[in-house]
A protein has these predicted regions:
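Catalytic-core elements of nucleic-acid end-processing and repair enzymes
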Residues: 1-281
Length: 281
């Protein structure tokens, strides 16, 4: 006997339970603002920023950002910092050390219900839920800007220590992940109630004097940053997508580009046509 499809209501029950498990959450506390979610179309995908999914790509970050900045300088001209540029480039599709998250569990559910890009990927989706204890997003954003703007591959230990001291940043700050709530001047981030987890710098040959993470450190820390997960079976995805559409979560509202909005219109019209064929059949 087949299990009944999961519903949005089932999922929201899990979300509510995840807020108050293991004594981490108290009802009506400010800490709920720091609960975040990430939806992935395949449960088999690693929980890693795109830059770190290929070990050979990690040390090309500066070159990739410089090339993108040169090619797209008009599109990036209104960004107030290099970190804002990286955030925008992330949404354009550049591989970065940023991991997209959202404060809206229904947005995460929408992404978890998409179809994986590769045919061999596991078709079940997943939503991860995490919590940043005592997160000060303003401070984290400031630290993240500092970490982004200083490439420790190009400086020695003394210079690195001096830069940290001058900017009131510790070396430990440079070796941990940071929760970033960016300025909502990007319509797509605003539409998705989006934020990011920024992974730290990686030093290829780790010097004991530098507190810079290894790739293994980042994988481990990201796993601990998401304490719960909810599997979305493949056979429930289409019905959940329909429920989300009824609730106002669809391609036209979550994405701001015209292509996605027009694709949504086409898909709605295709469904109407199929429905008419079924009635007449």
């Amino acid at each position: 006997m087949n299990k009944p499809d999961l519903t949005v209501s089932d999922y929201l029950k899990w979300v509510n339970e995840s807020h108050y498990v293991e004594g981490l959450f108290e009802k009506d506390t400010m800490y709920q603002d720091h609960v975040y979610f990430r939806g992935q179309a395949s449960v088999s995908w690693e929980l890693l920023p795109s830059l770190f999914r290929d070990s050979e790509r990690i040390h090309d970050e500066n070159m990739m950002l410089e090339m993108a900045n040169n090619m797209l300088w008009t599109e990036l001209n209104d960004c107030r910092s290099d970190l804002e540029k990286m955030i925008r480039l992330q949404h354009y599709g550049l591989h970065t050390r940023l991991l997209d998250i959202t404060y809206n569990p229904l947005v995460a559910l929408f992404f978890a219900c998409q179809t994986p890009s590769k045919p061999d990927d596991d078709k079940d989706g997943v939503v991860y839920c995490g919590y940043k204890e005592g997160a000060n997003t303003k401070t984290s954003y400031t630290i993240a800007e500092y970490v982004f703007n200083h490439n420790v591959f190009d400086i020695n230990q003394t210079a690195f220590e001096n830069i940290c001291k001058k900017n009131n940043v510790t070396q430990e700050d440079c070796g941990t992940i940071h929760l970033i709530t960016p300025p909502l001047n990007n319509p797509r981030i605003s539409a998705q109630n989006g934020a990011f987890i920024m992974s730290p710098l990686i030093k290829k040959d780790v010097d004991s004097h530098f507190y810079i993470a290894t790739q293994a450190d980042i994988k481990k820390e990201l796993k601990t940053a998401f304490m719960k997960r909810y599997i979305i079976p493949e056979n429930s995805k289409s019905s959940i997508i329909e429920e989300l559409d009824y609730l106002g979560f669809n391609k036209a509202t979550i994405f701001v580009d015209i292509t996605q909005k027009l694709q949504y219109i086409n898909e709605k019209e295709d469904k109407k046509t199929m429905w008419k064929i079924d009635l007449n059949g």
